[in-house]
C-alpha cells in the first residue's frame, strides 16, 4: 500500500482551512422559584419584555417582569412539571398565532392551537403577533354600515355599525351572552349570500367560563349552521390565568386578518371582567404594585389597547372593518365599579341589561333609558330611522308617566293614550332567544307599533299579532318585504302598500 504523505497533508490542510466552528448558542437561565403559574428565572440577561421562553417539556412562558437580578415569567400551561434549577431557554420571538379562513368552524385555545379534536389546522394564511398597535387616525373612516343584530330593541334604538365597539353590560344571568349569540346567528343570511364584501366573519372568545357552557355554545352555533363562519377561542376557568389574559388578544389578531384584507369581522369578548381578574392575579403574583380594587395601574391600558384595534378602515386600506362586542359582568347593577367605568369610557356605547326587567319577563332585558349607541345612528338604515325615530322618546315618556301614574287614578286621555302605547311597544320589543328578525321584518313590525295599529289590541295579544303579521306578510306581500330589503328605505309607494296591508290585517285579526 502506497501512502502519499504530500497528498494526505494537502487534504488535512484543506479540512483545517474550511473548518467552521458552528456552535449553536442559546441564551439560557435557571429557575429560582416556581408556583401559581409564575416562575422566577435567573440568568436570561438579554431577554426582552413580552418575549417567549421555553421550560423543560416544551412548556412555553412569557417574560413580563425584568428585574435587576431575575426575570418574572408567566407560564402558559401546567407548572407542576417545572422545578427549581430547571433550564429555561429564550426563544427570541413574541407570542404569535395562526390566522386565516382555515380557522373558521374550529375551537382553539388561548395560543391558537386547536382543542376540538378535528386534527391540525388547515388553510392557515399566516402567523401574526397577538399584541400589535391599533390602526392610527388616518387609516380609519367613520362608522357608516349597519351591523344588524336581529334584535328589535337594539336595531331600532341602540343601532350598532360595522367598526363600532358596543359594550354589553349587566349582572350575571341577564342574557348578555344570548344577545351576542343572536347577533352571530343573525349573520347567517348575509354569509350564505354571494356578496363577498357584505359577509361578516365572527369570532367568539370565552374567557374564564365553564367548559360545559362553551360546549353548549358550540352546539348551538353548530345546530343553527353558524359555526361555518365562526371561530371560537376558549380559555376556560380551568386554564391558567396567563391563557385567560392572552385569549382576547389572540382572537383579536385573528379578527384583524379579516379587517386588514378588506373583509368584515365581529368579535365577542365574553367577558372582559374575567380577563381583568386573570391579569390582576398575574400582576399581584409578579409583585407589581396594586391600585384601586387591587387591580394593577395599567388595567385601563389592558382594555384600551385591545378595544382600540376594532376599527372601520378607509378605501385606501381596503375598507375592512372589525366590530367588537365586549361583555362586562356587574355586581348588583353597580355600573360605577372600576372595570365597568373603564370599559364604558373606552367603548362607543353600551347595552345595559337589568335583572328586574329580566324577571318581569321583558327579554331581552335591555334598559332602553340607560343604553346608548354613540356612533351607530350614522349606520342605521334609512327605513329603520323612518319607523323607529320617535320610539326611544315615546318609551322614555312612558316610563316617566308610568312612575307618576302609580300615585293618581284619574288620568287625562292624552296620558292614558301614552301609557297604552308604551305598554304595547314594551310588549312588542320582547323577543325569544335564537330567533333574530331581518331588517325588513323589524321595519314592518315596528311601523305597526309606532303608528298605532296595536293601540286597540289587548297587551296579551301583541306577540301573537306580531307572529301572525310576519306570516301574513311573507305569504301575501313578499314583494313589499323584498322592496324594503333592496331599497333600504320606505318609499311612498312601499309605505302606502304597508299601510293598506296593516289596516286590512288588523281589521281581520282576532
From Swiss-Prot:
Pfam families linked: ATP-synt_ab, ATP-synt_ab_C, ATP-synt_ab_N
InterPro entries the record matches: ATP_synth_asu-like_sf (IPR023366), ATP_synth_asu_C (IPR000793), ATP_synth_asu_C_sf (IPR038376), ATP_synth_F1_a_nt-bd_dom (IPR033732), ATP_synth_F1_asu (IPR005294), ATPase_a/bsu_AS (IPR020003), ATPase_F1/V1/A1_a/bsu_N (IPR004100), ATPase_F1/V1/A1_a/bsu_N_sf (IPR036121)
Record's bilayer topology term: Peripheral membrane protein
Annotated EC: 7.1.2.2
Coiled coil: none
Site (Required for activity): 371
Keywords associated with the record: ATP synthesis, ATP-binding, Cell inner membrane, Cell membrane, CF(1), Hydrogen ion transport, Ion transport, Membrane, Nucleotide-binding, Translocase, Transport
Reactions catalysed according to its record: ATP + H2O + 4 H(+)(in) = ADP + phosphate + 5 H(+)(out)
EC category: translocase
PANTHER family (UniProt xref): ATP SYNTHASE SUBUNIT ALPHA, MITOCHONDRIAL (PTHR48082:SF2)
Family the entry assigns: Belongs to the ATPase alpha/beta chains family.
Purpose of the protein: Produces ATP from ADP in the presence of a proton gradient across the membrane. The alpha chain is a regulatory subunit.
Quaternary organization: F-type ATPases have 2 components, CF(1) - the catalytic core - and CF(0) - the membrane proton channel. CF(1) has five subunits: alpha(3), beta(3), gamma(1), delta(1), epsilon(1). CF(0) has three main subunits: a(1), b(2) and c(9-12). The alpha and beta chains form an alternating ring which encloses part of the gamma chain. CF(1) is attached to CF(0) by a central stalk formed by the gamma and epsilon chains, while a peripheral stalk is formed by the delta and b chains.
Protein name: ATP synthase subunit alpha
Organism: Maricaulis maris (strain MCS10) (Caulobacter maris)
Gene: atpA
Amino acid at each position: 500500500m502506497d501512502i502519499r504523505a504530500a497528498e494526505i497533508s494537502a487534504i488535512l490542510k484543506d479540512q483545517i482551512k474550511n473548518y467552521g466552528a458552528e456552535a449553536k448558542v442559546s441564551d439560557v437561565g435557571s429557575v429560582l422559584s416556581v408556583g401559581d403559574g409564575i416562575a422566577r428565572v435567573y440568568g436570561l440577561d438579554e431577554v426582552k419584555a413580552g418575549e417567549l421562553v421555553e421550560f423543560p417539556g416544551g412548556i412555553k412562558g412569557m417574560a413580563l417582569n425584568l428585574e435587576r437580578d431575575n426575570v418574572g415569567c408567566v407560564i402558559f400551561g401546567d407548572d407542576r412539571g417545572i422545578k427549581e434549577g430547571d433550564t429555561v431557554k429564550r426563544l427570541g420571538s413574541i407570542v404569535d398565532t395562526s390566522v386565516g379562513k382555515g380557522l373558521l368552524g374550529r375551537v382553539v385555545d388561548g395560543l391558537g392551537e386547536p382543542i376540538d379534536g378535528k386534527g391540525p389546522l388547515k388553510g392557515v394564511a399566516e402567523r401574526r403577533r397577538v399584541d400589535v398597535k391599533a390602526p392610527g387616525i388616518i387609516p380609519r373612516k367613520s362608522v357608516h354600515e349597519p351591523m344588524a343584530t336581529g334584535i328589535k330593541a337594539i336595531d331600532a334604538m341602540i343601532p350598532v355599525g360595522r367598526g363600532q365597539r358596543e359594550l354589553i353590560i349587566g349582572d350575571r344571568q341577564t342574557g348578555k351572552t344570548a344577545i351576542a349569540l343572536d347577533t352571530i346567528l343573525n349573520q347567517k343570511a348575509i354569509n350564505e349570500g354571494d356578496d363577498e364584501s357584505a359577509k361578516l366573519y365572527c369570532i367568539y372568545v370565552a374567557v374564564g367560563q365553564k367548559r360545559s357552557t362553551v360546549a353548549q355554545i358550540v352546539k348551538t352555533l353548530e345546530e343553527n349552521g353558524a359555526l361555518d363562519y365562526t371561530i371560537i377561542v376558549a380559555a376556560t376557568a380551568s386554564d391558567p390565568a396567563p391563557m385567560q389574559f392572552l385569549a382576547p388578544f389572540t382572537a383579536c389578531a385573528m379578527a384583524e386578518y379579516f379587517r386588514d384584507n378588506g373583509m368584515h369581522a365581529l368579535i365577542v369578548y365574553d367577558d372582559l371582567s374575567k380577563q381583568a381578574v386573570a391579569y390582576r392575579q398575574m400582576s399581584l403574583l409578579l409583585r407589581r404594585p396594586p391600585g384601586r380594587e387591587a387591580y394593577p395601574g395599567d388595567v385601563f391600558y389592558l382594555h384600551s389597547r385591545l378595544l382600540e384595534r376594532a376599527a372601520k378602515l378607509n378605501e385606501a386600506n381596503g375598507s375592512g372593518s372589525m366590530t367588537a362586542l365586549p361583555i362586562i359582568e356587574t355586581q348588583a347593577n353597580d355600573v360605577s365599579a372600576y372595570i365597568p367605568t373603564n370599559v364604558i369610557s373606552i367603548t362607543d356605547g353600551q347595552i345595559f341589561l337589568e335583572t328586574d326587567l329580566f324577571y318581569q319577563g321583558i327579554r331581552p332585558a335591555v334598559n332602553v333609558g340607560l343604553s346608548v349607541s354613540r356612533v351607530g345612528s350614522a349606520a342605521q338604515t334609512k327605513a329603520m330611522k323612518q319607523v323607529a325615530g320617535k320610539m326611544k322618546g315615546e318609551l322614555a315618556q312612558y316610563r316617566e308617566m308610568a312612575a307618576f301614574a302609580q300615585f293618581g287614578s284619574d288620568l287625562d286621555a292624552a296620558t292614558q293614550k301614552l301609557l297604552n302605547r308604551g305598554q304595547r311597544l314594551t310588549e312588542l320589543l320582547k323577543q325569544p332567544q335564537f330567533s333574530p328578525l331581518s331588517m325588513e321584518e323589524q321595519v314592518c313590525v315596528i311601523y305597526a307599533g309606532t303608528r298605532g295599529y296595536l293601540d286597540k289590541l289587548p297587551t296579551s295579544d301583541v306577540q301573537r299579532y306580531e307572529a301572525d303579521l310576519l306570516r301574513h306578510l311573507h305569504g301575501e306581500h313578499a314583494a313589499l318585504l323584498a322592496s324594503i330589503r333592496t331599497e333600504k328605505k320606505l318609499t311612498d309607494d312601499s309605505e302606502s302598500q304597508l299601510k293598506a296591508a296593516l289596516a286590512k290585517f288588523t281589521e281581520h285579526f282576532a
